[in-house]
A protein has these predicted regions:
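N-terminal small/polar loop signature for handling phosphorylated ligands or for N-terminal nucleophile
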Residues: 1-49, 53
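Hydrophobic helix-and-loop "lid/oligomerization" segment in the mid-to-C-terminal part
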Residues: 1-9, 28-31, 111-189
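Short glycine-rich anion-binding loops that position phosphate/pyrophosphate groups of nucleotides
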Residues: 39-42, 63-65, 180-183
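Short alpha-helices
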Residues: 62-128
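Short helix/loop capping segments that flank catalytic or ligand/cofactor-binding pockets
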Residues: 44-46, 68, 185-186
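Solvent-exposed alpha-helices and their adjacent loops that cap or buttress functional pockets
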Residues: 26-29, 49-52, 67, 97-99, ...
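Short beta-strand segments
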Residues: 35-38, 61, 108, 177-179
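Hydrophobic/aromatic beta-strand patches that form the interior of the parallel beta-sheet core
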Residues: 33-35, 56-60, 72-75
Length: 189
């Protein structure tokens, strides 16, 4: 098991600190149902072959490019995030949402909406955000933890990306690239 990533610990208070387990560190064979959420084909497929034939696989996502087979697939591109989908499931099935769950769900929404700044922000996701805040999820603190605590390495990496950026006036597109070497050299891994 991995501890909660250090930058996220201010969002949770003991004894509610969650422990994160990587799939490789969990005996997934011992579960009847395995759920994967958010960009599931960008990692879930690397260990899916370890599942038993009789295990139920549930995929939850808001990205349109998910084509992985599952027993239950819940993909809705009209939602801002997988967290919004999970919230609505809990709401429809009258599943109580604890403070740590409300915080985690709001964190997912804030991340996928760019702190409510992206074009995927809808009145519905704003309502969900308000409901999670009513349950105690700390919006300002989540925004600060996710977006305002930029490490020096991240700033250096942005510098490299901007330095290499090229503008194409015919399309209005700006293109840049960063490499794994850049990540390493900027200490932004």
């Amino acid at each position: 098991s991995d501890p909660l990533p250090e930058k996220l610990t201010p969002l949770f208070t003991a004894p509610a600190l969650p422990v994160f387990h990587l799939p490789t560190d969990v005996d997934v064979q011992s579960y009847d149902v395995v759920m994967a959420a958010d960009s599931v084909d960008r990692g879930f497929d690397t260990w899916r072959s370890t599942l038993r034939e009789d295990q139920i696989v549930v995929l939850i996502d808001h990205h349109p490019d998910i084509d992985m087979p599952a027993d239950i697939t819940l993909i809705d591109t009209e939602h801002s995030s997988s967290s919004e989908i999970v919230y609505e499931y809990f709401e429809q099935h009258q599943i109580p949402i604890t403070l740590p769950v409300a915080t985690a769900l709001l964190m997912g929404i804030v991340f996928d909406t760019g702190n409510f700044k992206h074009t995927n922000v809808t009145p519905r996701v704003m309502r969900v955000g308000v409901e999670l805040m009513k349950l105690g999820a700390p919006l300002a603190q989540i925004g600060n933890v996710l977006f305002a605590q930029t490490r020096v390495g991240g700033v250096k990496l942005w510098g490299r990306a901007l330095e290499r950026a090229r503008y194409f006036p015919t399309t209005g597109m700006v293109v840049t690239a960063i490499t794994t070497r850049d990540l390493r050299e900027c200490d932004a891994e």
